[in-house]
């Protein structure tokens, strides 16, 4: 693709995303399905703006690559060892069982047994990009079902290596083309990457960070991710697996959070590009001529994978309310099928339109997942939040609460218990099914659902409530809720949890003045105790704590992100000097009088 064509394609991609995703969100079908529909619209079978789908699809795999790097950063070798049972137990069982059943069905559909085996393995894989995105949207990341889902996806990525090696063997070209020496060299190169990364990455990033130039650090991060992907691709292995390993090697480093921040903007854009490319690859011509075959294949694929996953989740001990979410989020075909089927086609394993039919099936199955998740979400909401008497029954009992608490994790539980102890009428909304079930056993009135949906807030009593307390784990969810409340329920008094200064600035800019930084108060209290342990009078330590709190809040309001770094540094130094002067005056005053105790907040 030439430079001008690449620029035109970039503009078309951005326009399609900007137009389709907000529309999809308004319709409630999710961003992923919006990207897929946008791809269909601008692809060769839609308006025909872009025809070179294969090249763009290969480039767009970088979205999955960046996503896997960030996932690797969130894990460490000890955590992977803890997940070994779910990775090599449930993950292996899912791939083998699904592949065996699907391969048998493909043989009944007149596929050669070699092609059926490859087809079964490819269809057994799920979409890492789609599943992880949906799990994040549905708040499954921290749940038991989400952890198990990640383990299954990780095993599928690991299975890429033997699956690709199996293709030439099935094609009967092992003696002519399959070079075991090359395989051994690939394994050796892979081992060198592991060992080199283990001992070299930290010193390299320490040297780069010492320069103090953030742009260079970002460039080094991109270089690491792209180099790992290119290296694995040259070996004929999964690019995503290579960057995942690089992330794991850096998971325990002091640069973990900075690396994640540097990559995050690129990940989101490239993931969107990946889903658009998948939509573009949908061959509507094959769909039109084999409509019944494709429709039946999609249904059979989704049902078989859901049944397999549901059974494994039950054997693993996942709660019944979480099994359907786990089974549905992994029910689609995945991006690995495109790679595996292309390799098999080059070995002439498929006949006629067989490869095209399989690819259309995979693409359409990916489009069913967001809709399936939405339907299961509604079913779970009604099931967990009370029996359904008629179609108009709200998801949440409307008992006209005074306060709505969103999120019932450790942070939200303390707030809810305090409010209930003071006889306040509250409604708690939580999207982690496991947490809902557990808290209900203890007698808490917790309801399942995604609070970023206006309908759920309305049925929870937002129109009659006085306040809403937002304690979401994800800052994006917090800001989305703030926007929804300001737009649809402007009378609500909004109180929110901020994970740090960045989130606090965002809340202030959105007009939310009542918030709490989750570690700030506890850190101040421990600091006060430290001052007392060093010999300071308790009254003086208390006043020091209060002065620090007030000055820090004032700085938070003044040092908004628009200021330059130099202005922020200058103002921070000025504030530190001001704080020291206040403490000096307090010291002199306390020496004169330490009898009385002032009223403190």
Curated annotation (Swiss-Prot):
Q: Transmembrane residues, as ranges?
A: 4-24, 29-49, 55-75, 87-107, 111-131, 152-172, 177-197, 207-227, 230-250, 262-282, 284-304, 324-344, 356-376
- Where does this protein have coiled-coil stretches? none
* InterPro entries, per database record: Cation/H_exchanger_TM, K/H_exchanger, K_H_efflux_KefB, K_uptake_TrkA, Na+/solute_symporter_sf, NAD(P)-bd_dom_sf, RCK_N
Give the membrane topology: Multi-pass membrane protein
Enumerate the spans annotated as RCK N-terminal domain. Answer: 400-519
GO cellular component terms given for this protein: plasma membrane
**GO terms (BP aspect):** proton transmembrane transport
> Which GO molecular function, any one, fits this protein according to its record?
glutathione-regulated potassium exporter activity
- Which HAMAP family does this entry report, sorted A to Z? K_H_efflux_KefB (MF_01412)
What the entry lists under NCBIfam families is as follows:
2a37, PRK03659.1
**Could you describe the subunit structure of this protein?**
Interacts with the regulatory subunit KefG.
The text of the family note is:
Belongs to the monovalent cation:proton antiporter 2 (CPA2) transporter (TC 2.A.37) family. KefB subfamily.
Function per UniProt: Pore-forming subunit of a potassium efflux system that confers protection against electrophiles. Catalyzes K(+)/H(+) antiport.
Q: What is this protein called?
A: Glutathione-regulated potassium-efflux system protein KefB
Task: Give the originating organism.
Answer: Salmonella dublin (strain CT_02021853)
């Amino acid at each position: 693709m030439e430079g001008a064509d690449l620029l035109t394609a970039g503009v078309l991609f951005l326009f399609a995303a900007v137009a389709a995703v907000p529309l999809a969100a308004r319709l409630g079908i999710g961003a992923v399905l919006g990207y897929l529909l946008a791809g269909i619209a601008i692809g060769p079978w839609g308006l025909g703006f872009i025809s070179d789908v294969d090249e763009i699809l290969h480039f767009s795999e970088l979205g999955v690559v960046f996503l896997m790097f960030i996932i690797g950063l969130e894990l460490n070798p000890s955590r992977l060892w803890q997940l070994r049972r779910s990775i090599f137990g449930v993950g292996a069982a899912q791939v083998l069982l699904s592949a065996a059943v699907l391969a048998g069905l493909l043989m009944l559909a007149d596929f050669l047994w070699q092609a059926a085996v490859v087809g079964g393995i490819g269809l057994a894989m799920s979409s890492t990009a789609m599943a992880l995105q949906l799990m994040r949207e549905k708040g499954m990341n921290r749940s038991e079902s989400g952890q198990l889902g990640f383990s299954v996806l990780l095993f599928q990525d690991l299975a890429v290596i033997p699956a690709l090696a199996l293709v030439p063997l099935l094609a009967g070209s092992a003696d002519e083309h399959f070079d075991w020496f090359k395989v051994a060299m690939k394994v050796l190169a892979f081992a060198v990457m592991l060992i080199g990364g283990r001992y070299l990455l930290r010193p390299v990033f320490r040297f780069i960070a010492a320069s103090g130039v953030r742009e260079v650090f970002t460039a080094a991060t991109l270089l690491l991710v792209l180099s790992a992907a290119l290296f694995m691709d040259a070996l004929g292995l999964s690019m995503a697996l290579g960057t995942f390993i690089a992330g794991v090697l850096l998971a325990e480093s002091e640069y973990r959070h900075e690396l994640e921040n540097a990559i995050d903007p690129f990940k989101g854009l490239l993931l969107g590009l990946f889903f658009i490319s998948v939509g573009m690859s949908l061959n509507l011509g094959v769909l039109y001529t084999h409509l019944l075959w494709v429709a039946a294949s999609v249904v059979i694929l989704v049902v078989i994978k859901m049944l397999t996953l549901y059974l494994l989740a039950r054997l693993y001990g996942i709660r019944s309310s979480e099994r359907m979410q786990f089974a549905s989020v992994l029910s689609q075909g995945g991006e690995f099928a495109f790679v595996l089927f292309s390799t098999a086609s080059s070995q002439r394993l498929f006949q006629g339109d067989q490869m095209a039919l399989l690819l259309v099936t995979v693409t359409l199955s990916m489009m069913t997942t967001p809709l399936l998740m939405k339907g299961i979400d509604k079913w779970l909401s009604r099931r967990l939040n009370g029996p359904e008497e008629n179609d108009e029954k709200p998801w949440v009992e409307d008992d006209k609460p005074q306060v709505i608490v969103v999120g019932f994790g450790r942070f939200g539980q303390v707030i809810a218990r305090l409010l209930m102890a003071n006889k306040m009428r509250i409604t708690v909304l939580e999207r982690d099914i496991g947490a809902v079930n557990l808290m209900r056993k203890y007698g808490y009135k917790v309801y399942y659902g995604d609070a970023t949906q206006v309908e759920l807030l309305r049925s929870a009593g937002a129109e009659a409530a006085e306040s809403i307390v937002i304690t979401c784990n994800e800052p994006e969810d917090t800001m989305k809720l703030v926007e929804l409340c300001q737009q649809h329920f402007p009378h609500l008094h909004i109180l929110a949890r901020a994970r740090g200064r960045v989130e606090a600035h965002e809340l202030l800019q959105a007009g939310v003045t009542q918030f709490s930084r989750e570690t700030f108060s506890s850190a101040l209290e421990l600091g006060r105790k430290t001052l007392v342990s060093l010999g300071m009078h308790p009254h003086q330590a208390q006043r020091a704590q209060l002065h620090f709190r007030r000055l820090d809040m004032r700085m938070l309001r003044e040092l908004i992100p628009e200021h330059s770094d130099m202005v922020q540094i200058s103002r921070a130094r000025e504030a530190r000097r001001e704080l020291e002067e206040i403490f000096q005056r307090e010291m002199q005053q306390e020496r004169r009088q330490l009898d009385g105790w002032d009223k403190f907040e």
